[in-house]
Amino acid sequence: MAFALGQRWISDTESDLGLGTVVALDARTVTLMFAASEENRVYASNDAPVTRVVFNVGDVVECQEGWSLKVEQVVEENGLYTYLGMREDTEETGVALREIFLSNQIRFNKPQDKMYAGQIDRMDNFVLRYRALKNQYEQHRSPMRGLCGMRAGLIPHQLYIAHEVGRRHAPRVLLADEVGLGKTIEAGMIIHQQVLLGRAERILIVVPETLQHQWLVEMMRRFNLHFSIFDEERCIEAFAESDNPFDTQQYVLCSLDFLRKSRKRFEQALEADWDLLVVDEAHHLEWSQDKPSRGYQVVEGLAERTPGVLLLTATPEQLGRESHFARLRLLDSDRFYDYAAFVEEEAQYAPVADAITALFSGVKLADEAKNQITELLSEQDVEPLFRIIESNADEESKAIARQELIDNLMDRHGTGRVLFRNTRAAIKGFPVRNVHLLPMPIPTQYTTSMRVSGMIGGKLAPEARAMKNLYPEEIFQEFEGEESSWWQFDCRVNWLLEKLKAQRSEKVLVIASRASTALQLEQALREREGIRATVFHEGMSILERDKAAAYFAQEEGGAQVLICSEIGSEGRNFQFANQLVMFDLPFNPDLLEQRIGRLDRIGQKRDIDIHVPYLQGTAQEVLARWFNEGLNAFAETCPTGRTVYDQVSDQLIEMLASGSNEALNDVIAESAKLNQALKADLEQGRDRLLEMHSNGGEKAQQIVAEIAAKDGDTNLVSFALSLFDTIGLNQDDKGENAIVVTPSEHMMVPSYPGLPYEGATITFDRDTALSREDMHFISWEHPMIQGGIDLLMSEGVGTCAVSLLKNKALPVGTLLLELIYAVDAQAPKRSGIGRFLPRTPIRLMMDARGNDLSAQVEFESFNRQLSPVNRHLASKLVSSVQNDIHRLIEAGDQLVVENVEAIRQQAQQEMQQSLNSELERLQALKAVNPNIRDEEIEAIDAQIKELNGYIAKAQFQLDSLRLIVVSHN
């Protein structure tokens, strides 16, 4: 291929990009700019999947300025073409049009040309292509786009938050749900929607170091988003590709420490243009008005440069008011500029909360409540709504009127748009925790080794000594060697074996602090009783952990027990089990909550049994009793645990280090009293209004119902299997709702999008996917389906076919021509065009006289009456009626113009209606709620103008056609 600057080429694999221009060349690569879709592509020049665009005499070509030229002569000079001919608008002759000025929106690859050339496709491929077009159109139009395909349970408050935030332009919000309510999933859903809608192409996630892998796995497993972890080593590697390593990947995940410690890397991260910044554990960012921490400054710098920001943090009550204000300041420093003003404003929300509570309760509104609501909504006339609520209207009308008042009041609520927070108290459906504390006698082997260790290890700091005393099996191994079988005499192991034998049908999760303990416990279960167990620790790769988790999840033939180390279990959830054994205890109340959170999460169907075997007279007993009696941390979530621990830690560490528990009862009493007081403060500070707003109420239930209705879509299953067949993938039914899909030697393309080289196990069932992490959950949004549809379209699969209709009511040889047109507007994805005018199929069924019968002849039922024709016969049939086909296509082109105009008008109308009502709502709110950002209003205004232009320029093209001939035998 000989390239030259300014030449026009079209992509073979991405024809929707429009016409490309060669803008850069070097020894090995060529860069094409596709101005219509605002995309650039770099190809290897010796093997670029592009085709040179050359027009011939008689063709009509369009200039970028909008006028057309009928080509009369083609001149080539230095590899560039100039077209000479007549301008169709002014009829001026001898006009020259250089190829660089050709319109960027020219289309090619006509299906009729393929048909005339005898490149006729199989009938079932034509059918698959039409279904792909229809399904893709429906998916793009769906208001639930981006929410159906994630591997997560349908939990109302999560879906509500994601739906509310995910559609905004550059959302800047604080997600502050309590532990176990799924903030990571909410963030993932928002990211997923922003990516699918084209609003976020470059994303940076900043998390504590220990959570990097958890986020990597969650994004990949649940949302099919592949992030790259960046550390110093990765940045040095990436330097070969770019001066700024952060420019080498679109989706980047890194730790806050990494950016905090290296000014150079922080500055590089600042310079990379991100669309969305996500910060987890944002409550650890310390801030005070005069001295913000380095970590806070790092996030502040990134947040100032990035349009969209999601902060995931503890609840505002846990943070304290000032710290909570500091998070809001990161989102909008103009709005949250002064702490004192913020506190004063918060106090003014009490009447709003009272008014909404009155509406929620459904009781008759008192005059005082009505006056309050009228005053709060002073700029609108609320009397008609009051009349409906008090009339004899049906319950539904009353509920709608109530909801409208509630929505309007919510909008006035200061931080309602930037802060979402759900509590366990406000969300139903959590299991009861049954706690079983099991004191056990300490083996003499431990007593001896601990006494000796105490005598010779006197120099240890109290905290280190306390830590050591919690794990007597490790002290024993120090003296007897690592191979010593402590598990032969430890009564906790004996108890565990008996429990597992007694409950063979129950899945049991065992958590120990150390990886070595977990490995030795597995050995004990295997060697002593042949119990099927699997281990999970930080030394394993993500893939190995997945396999272990899948083995544990398997109902038949799976492991009965999963033994996890502390770090290994981070971020993994096993809701299908309800038996938790804590083989030892963590030092920290937050870690204890994390352990229980592996099972006690939203979505757990059964009550949980928590078993805590501990050795009497040891540090384990001190800690078990303090957690249980001082904090009640086993039976309930304990948001106050850390604060209480900080107050009594000195006395606690002293007891754990010395082994004496004389002061234990006093410390427990003091802790319990402190805990009660802190919890009462939290309850007092609960923001009822925020809770009502965050869980979404009735609206959240509707979203769940809508997605659940799509979940059992048999249409998807049959489409996916046909798609895999057509592209050439092997399929093997594995039972348990699972199919194994592997690449074959006869595939249409060397590698299939979204499918690993070794293949994948897939399921169409959400529940199966939730319990089996090794399976891909296939939905319309999954890359294997989206990529497959893109492949069909770009490879031109099914663009022309010939079928026979055996129908004795019609004369033999009767012709029908099925024409499928596609209407679309070439526009950048981020413009939001997909919501109003995605690629829209129009089907015409032309008879020999040029009448359209598509309204009378439905596609699927008609298709069942047709039979395929072999390629040789099909080619002969086409040759014999080529003139008729040509004539009917021309008639179809005339007819479709009206349909296209109607589609344009409908898209304009829907876009104006939807965006203008949102714009008006935000403008009205801006007057009463300073939380509405100017950028949001400006973005919608610009979007309306932009979309008007794109929709007006929407074009149609013939996507595919099928010739149907009537026969009687």
From Swiss-Prot:
Residues 164-334 form the Helicase ATP-binding domain. The keyword NAD does not apply. Pfam families: Helicase_C, RapA_C, SNF2-rel_dom, Tudor_1_RapA, Tudor_RapA. Its EC number is 3.6.4.-. It comes from the Bacteria. Interacts with the RNAP. Has a higher affinity for the core RNAP than for the holoenzyme. Its ATPase activity is stimulated by binding to RNAP. This is RNA polymerase-associated protein RapA. It comes from Vibrio vulnificus (strain YJ016).
